[in-house]
């Protein structure tokens, strides 16, 4: 049994249509990253973990993600294949490590989509509450019999809509996604412009109420805030999962990843700075923090606009991540590690239809049953684990194949940056609770079971 059989470096699979340009990739990345994190998580993280110093947490999280983005950019330019970290590790470490990375990526995007759907539901409920409407209790929250909630209906309904959209022509869907991203920017720009006139510098006086926190094992403070805000940047790697559909991938993928990450970081810092300046940070422990802050300063009209736009545009994150998740499942099935039905393409649109249906169904179930806070921590730890693997893979790539050639993206300061990334990611992982680690362990065991129960025996490498 050879668990470490490899694919050749740069092996590409035809089949999908190449139609995505640099602008499409930037919009895909921003659409995935600017969502629940900026509309919801910023408020709860400021209230419970870092206070106004959350802007420092964001810079730390962005730095960590930025390191990994550089690695993704180099891999994408040297190994142009759909599947992201999974495909890169397949070429460097072999099948079993690649499967672990691929499985963790599926877990990441499945929980990310469901988390965003939950954030969308929170804003929609807030808007309904302002109109005096409320869903029946049994359908108005994730599973918690003690308070009478059993399923959150709204995240399930929005995932049905998103799945239907992603099953349409991919180019048309991403054009629609671009329009919604621009609408999202209009709401955030309005928030910043209105918020500037309602800033109270006294709200920043207690800048770091929870301190810096512990480098390893902390539960509050700037580092704990950074570990949670890591959630905000997840999705940048979605670009590398659609390489087979990108024009000039070796040039456009690195540019798309870096540019979308830079734009997103600036936007998060501005919004968090204004948010914590408008309202005392302790009051921000709400699920619709941006709209809530506007209503607190008497700008209810702007708060309602932000709520409406959030309802419309959080769908962009669901679209971007469902798009990426379906391509990840397709990649695993194409290599024989998941049932071959998952690699079936629609004869006309060339969209992996069964993989898309599975992706949407898993996200709908998770969003309807699990609370947002537990979703965010679980997907973060899954992502951090495979980013550690990716950093090790870059070190091995450079050792065995040397520096990138002409026209390929080159990560600077190797091996310093990969080693630094490993240290930072491991530090973030220690910030999570025992229950998060248990969920991570169970997910790993399930993934290993699928690998040995199905994947190894059906792998294309057997042929």
Model-predicted segments: where are they?
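Loop-to-transmembrane helix boundary motifs in multi-pass membrane proteins
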Residues: 17, 22, 152-156, 247-255, ...
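Membrane-interface loop-to-helix entry segments
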Residues: 104, 121-124, 150-201, 257, ...
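C-terminal membrane-solvent junction of multi-pass transporters and transport-like membrane proteins
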Residues: 16, 147-151, 341-353, 387-437, ...
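Membrane-helix boundary/coupling elements in multi-pass transport proteins
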Residues: 39, 104-122, 228, 233-246, ...
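Membrane-interface "cap" regions at the ends of multi-pass membrane proteins
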Residues: 1-43, 47-52, 65-70, 82, ...
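Transmembrane helix-loop boundary segments of multi-pass membrane transporters
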Residues: 44-50, 54, 105, 116-122, ...
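Extracellular loop-to-transmembrane helix junctions
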Residues: 17, 41-145, 260-263, 440-448
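Helix-loop-helix junctions that connect adjacent transmembrane segments
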Residues: 11-17, 55, 132-153, 179-308, ...
């Amino acid at each position: 049994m050879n668990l470490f059989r490899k694919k050749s470096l740069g092996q590409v699979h035809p089949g999908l249509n190449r139609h995505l340009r640099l602008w499409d990739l930037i919009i895909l990345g921003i659409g995935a990253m600017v969502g629940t994190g900026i509309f919801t998580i910023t408020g709860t993280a400021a209230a419970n973990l870092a206070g106004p110093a959350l802007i420092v947490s964001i810079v730390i999280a962005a730095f960590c993600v930025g390191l990994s983005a550089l690695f993704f950019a180099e891999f994408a330019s040297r190994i142009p294949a759909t599947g992201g970290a999974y495909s890169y590790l397949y070429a460097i470490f072999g099948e079993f490590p690649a499967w672990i990375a691929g499985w963790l990526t599926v877990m990441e995007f499945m929980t990310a989509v469901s988390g965003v759907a939950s954030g969308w539901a929170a804003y929609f409920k807030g808007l309904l509450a302002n109109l005096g409407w409320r869903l029946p209790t049994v359908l108005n929250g994730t599973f918690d019999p003690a308070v009478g909630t059993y399923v959150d209906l709204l995240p399930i309904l929005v995932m049905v809509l998103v799945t239907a959209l992603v099953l349409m022509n991919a180019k048309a869907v991403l054009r629609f996604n671009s329009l919604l991203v621009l609408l999202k920017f209009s709401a955030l720009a309005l928030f910043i412009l209105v918020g500037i006139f309602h800033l109270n510098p006294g709200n920043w006086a207690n800048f770091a109420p929870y301190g810096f926190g512990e480098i390893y094992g902390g539960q509050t403070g700037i580092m704990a805030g950074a570990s949670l805000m890591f959630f905000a940047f997840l999705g940048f790697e979605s670009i590398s999962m659609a390489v087979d559909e990108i024009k000039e991938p070796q040039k456009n993928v690195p540019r798309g990843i870096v540019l979308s990450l830079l734009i997103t970081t600036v936007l998060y810092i501005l919004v968090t700075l204004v948010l914590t300046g408008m309202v005392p940070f302790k009051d921000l422990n709400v699920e619709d923090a941006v709209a809530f802050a506007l209503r607190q300063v008497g700008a209810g009209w702007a708060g309602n606009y932000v709520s409406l736009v959030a309802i419309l545009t959080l769908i962009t994150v669901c679209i971007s991540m469902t798009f990426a998740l379906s391509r990840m499942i397709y990649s695993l099935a194409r290599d024989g590690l998941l049932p071959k039905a998952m690699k079936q393409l629609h004869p006309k649109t060339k969209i992996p239809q069964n993989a898309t249906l599975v992706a949407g169904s898993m996200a709908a179930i998770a969003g309807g049953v699990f609370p947002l806070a537990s979703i965010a921590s679980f997907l973060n730890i899954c992502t951090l684990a495979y980013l550690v693997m990716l950093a090790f893979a870059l070190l091995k790539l450079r050792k065995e194949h040397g520096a990138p050639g002409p026209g390929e993206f080159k990560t600077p300061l190797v091996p310093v940056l990969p080693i630094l990334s490993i240290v930072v990611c491991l530090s973030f992982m220690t910030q999570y609770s025992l229950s998060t680690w248990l969920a991570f362990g169970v997910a790993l065991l399930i993934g290993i079971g699928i690998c040995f129960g199905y994947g190894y025996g059906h792998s294309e490498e057997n042929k």
